[in-house]
Amino acid sequence: MEFNIPEEKNMASSDTKKMKTVDMAYIALFAVIMAVCSWISIPAVVPFTLQTFGVFVAVAVLGGKRGTLAVALYLLMGVVGLPVFSGFSGGLGRLLGSTGGYIVGFVFSALVMWLMEHFFGTRTWVLALSMVLGLVVCYAFGTAWFLIVYARTTGPIGLWTALGWCVFPYIIPDLIKIALALAIRKRLASAIRVR
């Protein structure tokens, strides 16, 4: 006995597969964009990079789910040893170092943005607020990690010292990155229809 599948259903299935393929391509592309952003680096206690900008753009353009997957893929690429972190470095050791908490914090930052999108929508002010909250979460996780690792390897330091080294110098540049990511979103979101 032969079953004929209506042409319409066949096309819908093809469109779904195509959309998933397109989604995966965009997720991979934005993971690579984050890697390129990390290579643009100014050495410091916590290197000044454009990684947070890459995270913001990925979530803003791709949406919460796909953006978070792009950030997770970027992190996974680094864990397996690809040189995607600042200074063309990679490997688990980089994440276990004193500044690794900020890199892991990118995933938490993206998750915050995804949750905000899920509950409050994709209006620009919601996205801007979610980026700021995500940044605060990244700062908090990264600084806590830094304090623990630094205390084990060098000796204990105070919270204000850690914030002075790792957070305060980056606040204004990170807010500028948020503004730029929002501007880029307006340009790219209509061209990249993956939501």
Language-model-derived ranges and their functions:
Residues E2-A70, V80:
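Hydrophobic transmembrane alpha-helices
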Residues F3-I5, G78-V84, Y150-W160:
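Peri-membrane helix termini and adjoining interfacial loops of integral membrane proteins
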